[in-house]
């Protein structure tokens, strides 16, 4: 069977054919995402191997802008199994994100508004490069989360009712 005919599983491929390695599902629940940006990452070799193996957790991650650079904090990348203890990386190492200067300036301006933060949304392969999709988000209140759940429940009920008829 040719490469075009092969099907990829639903959980590790996205619409545009990129292979998804990790996703921060809780971020879309906790934050209202106002804008997104695709960035590259500055990684060590053992970090790349661990990420390709799927041993990464974006859940508690956040980004800061320091000295005109975007830094990724609190993203846990497990140590690589086959590397020695001296050659392995630190799991919670601060990673630099790669973006154009104009994009960084735009993010900096949007962060000056009160209550906004930059959060990692998903980590995926684009060709042979590992990319991180970050989003500028505003934290949701508890009542906002409840309202959103009610809307989603009603949409789900309508969809189920339409399936029956």
Swiss-Prot record:
GO cellular component, one term: cytosol
Recorded GO MF terms: RNA binding
GO biological process: trans-translation
Alphabetized UniProt keyword annotations: Cytoplasm, RNA-binding
Main localisation: cytoplasm
Localization in the cell: Cytoplasm
Region (Disordered): 1-21
A Pfam family: SmpB
Function per UniProt: Required for rescue of stalled ribosomes mediated by trans-translation. Binds to transfer-messenger RNA (tmRNA), required for stable association of tmRNA with ribosomes. tmRNA and SmpB together mimic tRNA shape, replacing the anticodon stem-loop with SmpB. tmRNA is encoded by the ssrA gene; the 2 termini fold to resemble tRNA(Ala) and it encodes a 'tag peptide', a short internal open reading frame. During trans-translation Ala-aminoacylated tmRNA acts like a tRNA, entering the A-site of stalled ribosomes, displacing the stalled mRNA.
Family to which this protein belongs: Belongs to the SmpB family.
NCBIfam families per the UniProt record, alphabetical: PRK05422.1, smpB
Protein name: SsrA-binding protein
């Amino acid at each position: 069977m040719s490469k075009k005919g092969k099907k990829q599983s639903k959980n590790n491929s996205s619409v545009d054919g990129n292979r998804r390695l990790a996703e921060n599902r809780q971020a879309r629940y906790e934050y209202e995402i106002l804008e997104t940006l695709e960035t590259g990452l500055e990684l060590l070799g053992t970090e790349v191997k661990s990420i390709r193996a799927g041993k990464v957790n974006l859940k508690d991650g956040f980004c800061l802008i320091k000295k005109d650079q975007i830094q990724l904090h609190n993203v846990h990348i497990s140590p690589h199994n086959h590397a020695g203890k001296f050659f392995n990386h630190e799991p919670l190492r601060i990673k630099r994100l790669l973006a154009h200067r104009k994009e960084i300036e735009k993010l900096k301006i949007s962060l000056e508004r009160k209550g906004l933060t930059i959060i990692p949304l998903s980590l995926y392969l684009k060709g042979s490069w590992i990319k991180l999709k970050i989003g500028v988000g505003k934290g949701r209140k508890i009542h906002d989360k409840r309202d959103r759940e009610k809307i989603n429940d009603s949409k789900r009920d309508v969809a189920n009712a339409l399936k029956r008829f």
